[in-house]
Structure formats: structure tokens, C-alpha cells
């Protein structure tokens, strides 16, 4: 039985947490930042958890995480 390939794009975007979840970065913080408020940018800064509905997709992309 061959090994399952990891989706490399997902491996770079998600990190496994000790509790079995996954950390992810928020979108909308790369460019065109002048029109976004300081509060909005500040709230986008910290990492977030992958939601329960998306967790199955992330787990399927990262079989060895």
C-alpha cells in the first residue's frame, strides 16, 4: 500500500494544536491595507482555529499531521 501524499499547500497553511485542532492565519492582511481600519487589521493579526465544519477537509489534506 503506497503512502498517502500530503497536500503541500495545506501543510504550509495549517499547524496542528495539542488539542487536535488546527491553527490558521486570517485572510485580508496582505495588501491594500490603507483603507482598512487599525481595529480591523489588529483583529486579523492573531491566529484562529479551523472551524468544525472545515476540520474534515484539513485532516484529509494532512494525513500525517
Swiss-Prot record:
A Pfam short name: Ribosomal_L35p
Ribosomal protein listed as a keyword: yes
GO cellular component terms given for this protein: cytosolic large ribosomal subunit
GO MF term list: structural constituent of ribosome
Keywords: Ribonucleoprotein, Ribosomal protein
InterPro entries noted in UniProt: Ribosomal_bL35, Ribosomal_bL35-like, Ribosomal_bL35_CS, Ribosomal_bL35_sf
UniProt keyword Chaperone, yes or no: no
SUPFAM superfamilies: L35p-like
Biological-process GO terms, alphabetical: translation
Family label: Belongs to the bacterial ribosomal protein bL35 family.
HAMAP family from the UniProt entry: Ribosomal_bL35
NCBIfam families: rpmI_bact
Protein name: Large ribosomal subunit protein bL35
